């Protein structure tokens, strides 16, 4: 096995940077013991750690849960991987539950339920939604990850989105009544977050799609848990998936 070979090679040198180099080879394949070694050996965030995290994120989008576990280990050690800071072209909008980095030129309105972001002639609606199950434990969150994969990975109009190891979801393209939309569902261990970009111009929608994805991935939670007051708001996102998938996922985070 590759890791044993790498351990052998790393043991043959006293050069710490060489040892890290060896373990990186295996860590970039989402091998958890190698990632654990990296976390033990590298004290602070470095460009190599950022690259490793990015590669693990790409692996996680293909359906490998060891990449999610590895990402979580890195996030706990290097917290800056998760907390996105605004760039010079962005501004921060926030409410009781989360904050977002949005383009400076956009017009944004936000309240505790959600809000809107206007980009040229397109509008992005966003909202927070209640989490229907408890997912504080890693094994419960991995069940949600697998449910999202089973639902969206086979769909050619959908894509898996990994903002971080505890902010996972999907992006879906749709056209209805000459309105083109791109919808994002992100699920954390605390809340659900929904984003919807709508435009009558398909080219404009596609042009802003990546911008909306960037906004969604910039989401940082405050830690507050959202509880829906209206019944209609309880039947969206993961709640809807759980209702339509009778395959044991309803047991996520619930006591026997």
Can you name each region flagged by the protein language model?
Residues 1-2, 6-11, 29-32, 38, ...:
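Short helix-capping/linker turns of helical repeat alpha-solenoids
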Residues 111-207, 251, 256:
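Conserved polar/disulfide-associated segments of primarily extracytoplasmic proteins
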Residues 25-26, 56-59:
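Canonical positions in the second alpha-helix
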Residues 12-22, 45-54:
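Structural signature of tandem alpha-helical TPR/SEL1-like repeats
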Residues 2-5, 9, 19, 38, ...:
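Structural register within alpha-helical repeat arrays
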Residues 5, 41-42, 59, 74-81:
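TPR/TPR-like alpha-solenoid repeats
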């Amino acid at each position: 096995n590759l890791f044993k070979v790498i351990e052998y090679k790393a043991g043959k040198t006293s050069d710490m940077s060489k040892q890290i180099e060896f373990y990186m080879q295996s860590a970039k394949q989402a091998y958890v013991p190698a990632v654990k070694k990296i976390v033990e050996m590298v004290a602070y965030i470095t460009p190599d750690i950022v690259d490793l995290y990015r590669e693990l994120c790409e692996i996680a989008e293909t359906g490998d849960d060891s990449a999610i576990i590895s990402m979580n280990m890195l996030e706990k050690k290097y917290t800056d991987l998760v907390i996105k800071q605004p760039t010079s072209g962005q501004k921060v909008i926030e409410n009781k539950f989360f904050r977002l980095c949005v383009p400076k030129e956009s017009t944004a309105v936000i309240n505790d339920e959600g809000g809107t972001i206007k980009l040229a002639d397109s509008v992005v609606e966003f909202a927070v939604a209640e989490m229907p199950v408890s997912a504080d434990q890693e094994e419960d969150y991995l069940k949600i990850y697998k449910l999202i994969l089973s639902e969206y990975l086979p769909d050619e109009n959908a894509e898996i989105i990994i903002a971080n190891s505890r902010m996972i979801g999907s992006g879906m393209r749709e056209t209805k009544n000459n309105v083109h939309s791109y919808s994002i569902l992100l699920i954390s261990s605390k809340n659900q977050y929904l984003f919807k970009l709508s435009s009558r111009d398909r080219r404009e929608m596609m042009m802003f799609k990546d911008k909306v994805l960037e906004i969604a991935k910039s989401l940082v939670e405050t830690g507050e848990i959202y509880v829906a007051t209206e019944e209609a708001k309880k039947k969206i996102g993961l709640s809807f998936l759980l209702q339509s998938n009778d395959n044991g996922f309803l047991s996520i985070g619930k006591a026997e």
